[in-house]
């Protein structure tokens, strides 16, 4: 089993004595986060989001409240109501973000990073989607393996809550976790998650350099730009600018632009199409050398 010291060395926590908010569902990842944060000397406040989507959700909330009571720390239970159905994961994620403190730390692990990278890849994401979560200070456990975290929780004498929906094959992430990644391990004859995490870090480093080189582009709004000038840009630069602009103008943040949408938007800028439909019922059009988003 990985020692507590080795786990702490892999974490990217703020200095000991810092007051932090933790998002704690009661599952092994977030419980491991809370235990390690306290072992590191952080002053924690626990935040639990009750989606009221599972029969056991009230028990999860009571479990987290009990942890806070035993540890003598503050806890905040956020009640949200997310109805089961289509796009549940995205809607639940948006609901959590709406109520949790912006800087709340989460228990995302290296395995979550690998899964998200692959999910974004098959969704058609660009460079940003291929380096998800990297560099995010609210995700201090991205170098920690999920299995090591679960073993640590047990070794500390805790029994984490289990969410049965994490085994539901209707959710794409679960299939990526339980079917695709094990198959990739078998085909590659090695553990591929660390390789994916390493690739994500390399892509993130490239993104940072590109962002610095194109920082001035960020000041140009979608509606002020002249399409004739945009069309003269290198394709990679224009593609990056369009992706950023479309993401910024997504009203609820639940429809990040896919690669196919960005490519169609390129065609609009270059005059190859008058307009194109985007996710979320939006429409990008070109009129008199300028763009509009409806």
Locations of regions flagged by a protein language model:
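Core alpha/beta nucleotide-donor-binding catalytic domains of modification enzymes
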Residues: 1-182
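Enrichment for repetitive, rod-forming helical segments
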Residues: 100-103, 184, 214, 293
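Flexible helical/loop "lid" subdomain adjacent to adenine-nucleotide binding pockets
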Residues: 109-261
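AMP-forming adenylation/ATP pyrophosphatase catalytic core
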Residues: 2-29, 45-51, 80-82, 178, ...
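Solvent-exposed amphipathic alpha-helical surface segments
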Residues: 40, 71, 187, 249-253, ...
């Amino acid at each position: 089993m990985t020692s507590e010291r080795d786990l702490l060395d892999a974490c990217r926590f703020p200095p000991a004595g810092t007051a932090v908010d933790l998002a704690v569902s009661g599952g092994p990842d977030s419980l491991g986060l809370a235990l390690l944060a306290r072992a590191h000397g952080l002053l924690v406040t626990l935040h639990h989001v009750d989606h009221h989507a599972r029969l056991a959700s009230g028990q999860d909330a009571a479990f987290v409240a009990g942890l806070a009571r035993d540890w003598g720390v503050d806890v905040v239970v956020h009640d949200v109501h997310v109805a089961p159905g289509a796009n549940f994961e995205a809607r639940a994620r948006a609901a959590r973000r709406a109520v949790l403190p912006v800087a709340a730390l989460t228990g995302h692990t290296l395995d979550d990073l690998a899964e998200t990278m692959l999910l974004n890849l098959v969704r058609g994401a660009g460079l940003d989607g291929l380096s998800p979560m990297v560099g995010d200070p609210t995700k201090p456990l991205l170098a920690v393996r999920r299995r090591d975290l679960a073993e640590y929780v047990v070794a500390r004498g805790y029994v984490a809550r289990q969410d049965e929906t994490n085994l539901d094959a209707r959710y794409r992430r679960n299939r990526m976790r339980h079917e695709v990644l094990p198959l990739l391990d078998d085909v590659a004859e090695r553990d591929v998650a660390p390789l994916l995490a390493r690739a994500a870090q390399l892509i993130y480093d490239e993104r940072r350099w590109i962002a610095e080189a194109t920082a001035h582009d960020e000041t140009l709004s979608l509606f002020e730009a002249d399409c004739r000038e945009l069309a003269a840009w290198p394709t990679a630069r224009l593609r990056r600018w369009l992706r950023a602009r479309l993401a910024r103008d997504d009203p609820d943040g639940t429809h990040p632009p896919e690669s196919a949408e960005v490519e169609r938007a390129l065609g609009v800028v270059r005059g190859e199409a008058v307009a194109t439909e985007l996710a979320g019922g939006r429409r990008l059009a070109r009129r008199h050398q300028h763009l509009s988003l409806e």
